Amino acid sequence: MRKIIVTVAPVCHVGKEIPEECKNPLTPEEITEDVVNCYKAGACQVHLHTRDLKGNPTFELDVFQKTINMIREKTDM
């Protein structure tokens, strides 16, 4: 049997504007919930971007670290 790797990218990184039809989690809690659901469905890797509460991309370490910690508490990703 051939093995595959399933990667999930829960946060759309298309600039400042998020398309209306796109479900895009913003908070670490929302991102974690999506990642955990994908993990349960077979995903084994996450490609992560974070956003602030206004929907803008953010590279703030505390937001990223909180999100990573929450994901690691609930998965082995």
Language-model features and meaning:
Residues 30-34, 70-73:
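Glycine-rich loops and low-complexity Gly/Arg-rich segments
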Residues 31, 38, 49:
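Conserved, mostly hydrophobic/aromatic
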Residues 9-33:
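Active-site mouth loops of central-metabolism enzymes
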Residues 22-30, 55-66:
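Alpha-helix N-cap and loop-to-helix initiation/capping positions
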Residues 8, 45-54:
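Histidine-centered catalytic micro-motifs
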Residues 2, 57-77:
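Alpha-helix-loop-beta-strand connector modules within alpha/beta enzyme cores
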Residues 1-11:
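Glycine-rich, aromatic-flanked loop segments that form ligand/cofactor-binding clefts
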Residues 40-43:
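A structural motif
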